[in-house]
């Protein structure tokens, strides 16, 4: 099992972030009760896949470090778009497909996620698969890092996980899961019969600027190797930000 400090180093190195910045994200999550606590020595905290998923989300989805805790709390209140639609608009399902977009992709742990699972839950599953050595096998040998694209938006709550595996022309599959707020639709979205309506026009413009960050599979694979105690088996990453070892 890995320590929080080791996780910070891996995330900083694989995302190209300053280690001090990621350390502050981790400290803020600890204070907010969003990261596993522990003591010193043998009782020191050992991070979990969910700890790693929360720290990744904090770093990716926050323009400012001080926003990290709020970012994680927002993404802990998300739901995949198809599941949300099936739950709140059961009479308007034409073209929506199944409520769990992961169901036909072929990874049991993702397919068995409940409808109410969050973006962070899905991210934790991918990290667990990486720690078991199964994610790299799933991605194949053809540009495996590019088999996954993860986008996190701020301050708007929207994240996307895309997976595409191509081995040859007759062996390829893909999935895209979009996560937004799990709140029920606002009242303006339905008329008296329950039919969904377009949003009302506004007289003012919201000046907020949405930002999004994209990453590939590399951070997941390195975090998984760290949790499995196999980080030394992967190529060393060095840069201006930090070094893994």
Model-assigned labels for residue ranges:
Residues 35-36:
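Conserved hydrophobic residue
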Residues 25-32, 47:
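Basic amphipathic alpha-helical segments that dock to polyanions
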Residues 68-89:
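Leucine-rich, amphipathic alpha-helical/linker segments
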Residues 96-140:
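Acidic, glycine-rich loop-and-strand cores that form catalytic or ligand-binding grooves
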Residues 39-45:
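Short, Lys/Arg-rich nucleic-acid/phosphate-binding segment
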Residues 1-25:
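Polyanion-binding surface elements
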Residues 124-245:
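Glycine-rich, aromatic-bearing surface loops/beta-hairpins
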Residues 52-75:
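A short, Lys/Arg-enriched interface patch at domain edges and termini
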């Amino acid at each position: 099992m890995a320590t929080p400090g080791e996780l910070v180093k891996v995330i900083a190195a694989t995302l190209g972030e300053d280690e001090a910045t990621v350390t502050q994200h981790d400290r803020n999550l600890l204070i907010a009760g969003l990261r596993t606590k522990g003591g010193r020595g043998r009782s020191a905290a050992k991070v979990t896949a969910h700890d790693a998923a929360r720290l990744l989300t904090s770093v990716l989805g926050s323009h400012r470090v001080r926003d990290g805790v709020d970012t994680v709390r927002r993404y802990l209140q998300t739901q995949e778009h198809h599941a949300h639609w099936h739950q709140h608009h059961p009479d308007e399902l034409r073209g929506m497909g199944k409520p769990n977009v992961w169901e036909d992709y072929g990874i049991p742990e993702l397919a068995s996620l409940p409808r109410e699972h969050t973006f962070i839950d899905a991210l934790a599953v991918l990290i667990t698969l990486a720690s078991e050595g199964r994610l790299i096998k799933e991605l194949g040998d053809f540009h495996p890092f590019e088999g996954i694209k993860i986008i996190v938006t701020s301050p708007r709550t929207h994240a996307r996980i895309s997976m595409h595996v191509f081995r040859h022309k007759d062996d390829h599959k893909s999935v895209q899961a979009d996560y937004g707020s799990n709140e029920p639709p606002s009242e303006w979205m339905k008329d008296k019969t329950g039919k969904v309506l377009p949003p009302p026009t506004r007289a003012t413009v919201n000046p907020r600027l949405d930002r999004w960050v994209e990453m590939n599979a590399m951070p997941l694979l390195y975090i998984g190797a760290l949790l499995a105690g196999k980080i030394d088996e992967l190529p060393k990453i060095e840069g201006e930000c930090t070094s893994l070892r």
